[in-house]
Amino acid sequence: MRFFVVILCLSFVSVGWSASKPNVLFIAIDDLAPALRCYGDLIAKTPHIDRLAASGVRFDRAYNQLPLCNPTRASVMTGLRPDTIKVYDLDRHFRDEVPKAVTLSQTFMRNGWWAGRVGKIYHYNVPASIGTDGFDDPPSWKQTVNPKGRDKTDEHLIFNAEPHRKISGALSWLAAEGTDEEQTDGMIATEAIKLMAVKRNDKEPFFLGVGFFRPHTPYVAPKKYFAMYPLKDMRLPYAPKGDRDDIPTAAFAHNNPVPHYSLDALTCRKALQAYYATLSFVDAQVGRLMAALERLDLADNTIVVLWSDHGYHLGEHNGLWQKRTLFEQSARTPLIIRAPNAKGNGTACARIVEFVDIYPTLTDLAGLKNPKGPIALEGRSLKPLLKNPLAEWNGTAITQVLRPADKRLPKPVMGRSIRTVRWRYTDWAEGKSGVELYDHAADPMEFNNLALKPDPEAKAVMQRLRKLLEQKASGKVPTTPFNPKRL
């Protein structure tokens, strides 16, 4: 449930980049929706990420593999899909299934890079695990730093709109006293800059993971960021009357089964204000990292990849919040890659790409071989799109989510979805618990489920996409362990 930005300093032969081995700055932002000005959100004030997007390639159709923190982060770092690593919840570590997996940072270390982490790259329970190693993978790093700021000591001040739930999952927020640098994410930026300053003089290049905790709940940021978003300007997303009537029950996350958590509109608007405030706060920390790259004379030998672990609902479909769905808002995720002197820099890419593509992209750019073993990486390099964002691609994206049995569902249900340029097809329990089809050419907000009363064209599309989906994702509940309370 987070957002990631990856900055990589890499060597490139025959594509115009520096001949020396590049450094990698890998920045992850938690729970970041594409609610950024560079992605067309006119409310957001995100000048630093916007500037990064303008200097790199902004992927407008990038999709995560499972919109929940632990599975998606494990998938990115291993380059493997959830069905391969058997991670669907917040408790299972990918090494339980693939103990010999070679992670992205491990591959760089094996080829002469120093690899370190500041903050959240793998899963953390937020805010409980802030200041610890969280659900880390020790073989992935040579050094780790786990800052803990005043947001931890100020937790008793946080407003919780849903007191019956923990602040980790509830709509909760705090307009905090103090400076950016006192907050955990401000400290993360500070520590990352210190490491870059030290490592710039080392003989070995660095791969530095920088993981920010916000805008994950609770939405905590200094007061000045809340002031940037007057409450009068906050509007909840439009949804037509009866929007939910054609949507299967399983499509709604078990932790958000009723519209807006039954909260009133004013409270939801305050939550929206708080989300945008934390978004701008994290944007400022990204700006500090970018400024440090310039100041330390590292920018020309650094690739930047900015991404979040998944998308995020902000009230769409008449009251969906947070993640854990297969709708566009949860599956689609920010992804920006800036490679020095890449021909595609400054251009947006509308091709369909997946987060399993990040790993092979970075190894390709660095001229590294992917790890050998019984399991091959399951994505493909985006290097051709960094050269020419308009290049032919023929991409599809697969996203899954596992539902526990509850009052709504008599038994667990696997959901899986495939996104093409025009269509999104989703089925639940292989169709036994519902099917969805949305035509993004006519219905980009996914209001009209064509699978309910399909015409001949819709029937043909569903048949074709179901076959493609079955090739890459199981519709069955896994036989490996999972914790129903942590899905």
Regions picked out by a protein language model, each given a short descriptive name:
Residues 2, 17-429, 433-435, 444-467, ...:
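Formylglycine-dependent sulfatase
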Residues 5-14:
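Bacterial N-terminal signal peptides
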Residues 472-473:
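C-terminal tail/extension regions appended to the core domain(s) of diverse proteins
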